Amino acid sequence: MSAEREATEAATVAAAAEARAETGAGEGAPSQPPTVEVASDPQPPPAPEASASASAPPLRCLVLTGFGGYDKVKLQSRPAVPPAPGPGQVTLRVRACGLNFADLMGRQGLYDRLPPLPVTPGMEGAGVVVAVGEGVSDRKAGDRVMVLNRSGMWQEEVTVPSAQTFLMPEAMTFEEAAALLVNYITAYMVLFDFGNLRPGHSVLVHMAAGGVGMAALQLCRTVENVTVFGTASASKHEVLKENGVTHPIDYHTTDYVDEIKKISPKGVDIVMDPLGGSDTAKGYHLLKPMGKVVTYGMANLLTGPKRNLMAMARTWWNQFSVTALQLLQANRAVCGFHLGYLDGEVELVSRVVTHLLALYNQGHIKPRIDSVWPFEKVADAMRQMQEKKNIGKVLLVPGPEKET
């Protein structure tokens, strides 16, 4: 979708929002998910009193109804009512939303930041503002924004704090905006805030073909003479080379520690560790003096569509620990990063987003989209990511599946 077309859509949505507002106040759209499934309730919802809402189609959303496999995320609907955001909030129509490993872990009951079930997942998305609440002066109906939220983005219409929205550059598509925040904030803060990436450094990027991995590769290219080791299956190596990986490593057939030691006997300066378990220890022992391992995930917990108790036990048993004295003697650092626990650090996150948008406008970064799936195909989208078939970001879009 071109930026011009999206701008036209934004104007249309803004006009629609004003028209709805003139019909009178109504109940605000609930932020918690509905409980009526499309497939199981063919009867239309009761018509609201407002005439504009009476003819509006129901709003679609995805809801996690229980912990387990792909079928636990259901497509549901709720009646459309005039948006009524509270003070400091905005309501937007969602055009695209991101799929992240946290969503996969949440489905299995392994993500501690997930609100109680049933809940609409989704930490990020992009769309058009349709209404603003009291006290909001920096957003207006028609603004194209991207959103970073604790959950709830996998739905057609959502109300969020205005402070958690960011204006999109004119040239940015909704798909790019939905692919930017979680992956690029994570990669940026791991590499620069924790890693202090500088010219001449070397970096190990695990899962280099994933969303965070591809973001990290682009960010590494903004610094001169950075050597990048990237792990991924062999079929993805050519793409990794095209995107700045100096030494791709097939983790299926090769011990990445041995491969790195052959090329760089002293190791690397930064290890980006989304794996956890024994891989954190391996990363620590790969560090040069003054090196840093930054752990930001537990992907080793995910070995299938459902929770694997053996994998959980193995990962936790192999969890890495180190004493302060050992760190002192080794001249190394171990850091932890969890974007979900920075949801109250508005200024900190906004600073990073400002840097990222500047890099986007300068042409230094551009989210790579692996695939875009309609809400009906959410199970296929999750499978694509969990089986590590993706190169770049996997996205969801609210619109119904188009007939071919």
From Swiss-Prot:
Modified residues (N-acetylserine): S2
Membrane topology according to the record: Peripheral membrane protein
InterPro entries, A to Z: ADH-like_N, GroES-like_sf, NAD(P)-bd_dom_sf, PKS_ER, Quin_OxRdtase/zeta-crystal_CS, SV-ATPase_mito-regulator
Positions with biased composition (Low complexity): 9-24
Cited CDD domains: MDR3
Residue numbers spanned by region Disordered: 1-55
Predominant location: cytoplasm
Localisation: Cytoplasm; Mitochondrion outer membrane
Single Gene Ontology BP annotation: negative regulation of mitochondrial fusion
GO molecular function: oxidoreductase activity; zinc ion binding
Gene Ontology, cellular component aspect: mitochondrial outer membrane
SMART domains for this protein: PKS_ER
Protein's name in the database: Synaptic vesicle membrane protein VAT-1 homolog
Organism: Rattus norvegicus (Rat)
